[in-house]
Design a protein with these regions (language model features):
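Primarily recognizes Gram-negative and organellar outer-membrane beta-barrels
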Residues: 92, 115-157, 171-523
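Short, acidic, small-residue-rich periplasmic hinge/interaction motif at the N-terminus
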Residues: 2-47, 55, 67-69, 75-79, ...
Length: 523
């Protein structure tokens, strides 16, 4: 008992381990993180259906809302662009990104206020920020080729097909998207100068094909996109209504068929060149072309008593070609049959050039910005209608009839340009005196002419215009407008830029001048 230690030699122990089947550590990914002025969302924290697009994920983000037109707001701020790994995706187009970027490739989402090109380059905040959604691609999917495709077919010949192919290596990105469906899924933003239709109206078929690229070197950044969109909408509507008047009720019934086709081509590019450490040049050209064809036909009638008290379906007796045995003859007030055709073509182009030269490394710099845009639209409408007034007799004692046969053309064009020079001088630490001058000019012109085609009873709105129609212009229906706008803006401001706040004080001088020339009819 008094022995403090004793050497017993080497003791060998046999192995008797138990192998566990598995060990699982479960943790919930944080839904949102705040880093300075950036909100960061983890894609894995939100459940979405397999094969879902970005739109489904954005709907689940806290504070995010998507309206019926596809506009996105996050915490009350409207989203202006979608970016992929810091680069604009299809020019930053919101709806194209929402409909074509699969959730499976997204690791994180960041929302922040992106500074303007001028603020980013000069380091002097000009207050022109835009809220963007920047997506980070998952590791393993940001190198080489990857893509996805979905195809579906259902009853009544409903179909949907969508594909996306991506190539990412180093600082180069390339994306190819394509889709087609007739299930009212628009899949793109639309554009051009023709009429627009809401995505839930009628039977809508859409097709889109586009390519997006981005690449950069130490001195040059280049990105752009080209996209073709097609949208066809067939809308058939039937309406019955009753109006309550002081002396009784008025009843109206109508049928309408509308078919519209719209094709658009968009091209957006951005070039940023840094020939040396003190010079930066940014050039952004854009182009779009749109073409629209629309046909519509309608039949309507007004009655002084309820037509349903006489027949089961009064809408079957609105077409003038079906009134030989008219069961509603005694209660008719008036009726109209109308057919129209609309054609339009639009082209628009714009370009922005910014040149910045740093004069030292303390914030002294001079910047030139120039912008030009041009738009041209040709809109033609052909209309034929016949209105019968059953309670107003003509000179022969029969029903009065009003015929309309018109060709309406409305060409419009506009252009504007601006030039701005800005000089910044550092006068203290993070304090700048800024001088700026800008000149802006806008011009627009519209000339509406209506031609009476009643002297051409054989003319069909789907055929070519008859010879000599130009002499049948109706002066009283003509409209002409021309607008010119001139603006000068000279300003001086003092900017204080601190880590937690910014302060700007200044004054500006803005002489403006505008001229409007308007002519309607013969006046």
């Amino acid at each position: 008992a008094n022995v403090r230690s004793k050497n017993v030699g080497t003791i060998t122990l046999e192995t008797d381990a138990i192998m566990l089947a598995e060990a699982v550590v479960v943790a919930e990914a944080p839904q949102v993180q705040v880093v300075e002025d950036t909100l960061m969302y983890s894609s894995s924290a939100y459940r979405t259906p397999e094969g879902a697009m970005l739109e489904e994920l954005v709907k689940k983000l806290p504070g995010a809302e998507i309206d019926d037109d596809g506009n996105v707001t996050i915490n009350g701020k409207e989203l202006k662009k979608i970016m992929v790994d810091g680069k604009e995706f299809f020019g930053g187009d919101i709806k194209t990104g929402l409909k074509n970027l699969p959730v499976d490739i997204i690791d994180k989402l960041k929302t922040y206020d992106k500074k303007s090109d001028l603020a980013r380059i000069t380091g002097i905040d000009d207050g022109e920020e835009e809220t963007v959604l920047d997506l980070t691609i998952k590791k393993g999917m940001n190198k080489g080729w990857f893509g996805n495709a979905d195809v579906a077919y259902g009853t009544e010949d409903r179909y949907m097909a969508r594909m996306m192919v991506n190539y990412i290596v180093d600082k180069t990105q390339f994306s190819l998207i394509g889709s087609a469906n007739n299930v009212n899924d628009q899949g793109f933003s639309g554009g051009g100068g023709g009429p627009r239709w809401r995505r839930n109206n009628g039977l809508v078929a859409t097709k889109t094909l586009g390519a997006n690229f981005a690449t950069e070197t130490s001195k040059l950044e280049l990105d752009g996109s080209v996209r073709y969109d097609y949208k066809g909408a067939d809308i058939i509507s039937t309406n019955s209504s009753e109006r309550f008047l002081q002396n009784g009720s008025s009843y109206s019934n109508s049928n309408a068929v509308n078919k519209n086709k719209n094709s658009d081509v968009f091209a957006n590019f951005r070039l940023e060149w840094k020939p040396d450490s003190m010079t930066n040049i940014i050039f952004r050209p854009n182009f779009s072309y749109g073409k629209t064809n629309g046909t519509s036909g309608s039949e309507s009638g007004t009655f002084n008593s309820d037509p349903y008290s006489l027949i089961a379906n009064p809408n079957d007796f609105l077409d003038f070609d079906k009134l030989e045995d008219d069961p509603l003859e005694n209660i008719r007030v008036n009726a109209t049959n109308d057919a129209s055709l609309t054609k339009s073509k639009s082209i628009s182009t714009s370009a922005t050039l910014q040149l910045n030269r740093k004069l030292n490394n303390r914030g002294r710099n001079i910047t030139f910005r120039g912008r030009f845009s041009y738009g041209d639209n040709d809109n033609d409408q052909y209309r034929q209608s016949e209105t019968r007034y059953y309670q107003i007799l003509n000179a022969l004692g029969g029903d009065s009839v009003l015929y309309r046969n018109q060709y309406i053309t409305t060409p419009t064009n506009n252009y504007n340009y601006s030039a701005q020079v800005t000089y910044s001088e550092p006068i203290a630490r993070a304090t700048f005196l800024q001088f700026s001058y800008q000149f802006q000019y806008k011009y627009s012109e519209s000339d509406k002419t209506t031609f009476d085609m009643l002297d051409y009873p054989e003319w069909d709105i789907n055929g070519p215009l008859p010879s000599g129609y130009e002499s049948h212009a109706v002066d009283s229906l003509g409209k002409y407008a021309e607008y010119r706008y001139y603006n000068h803006d000279a300003s001086v401001s003092l900017r204080f830029i601190r880590e937690k706040y910014q302060l700007s004080a200044g004054m500006s001088f803005q002489p403006q001048h505008s001229v409007l020339s308007y002519k309607r009819g013969d006046y």
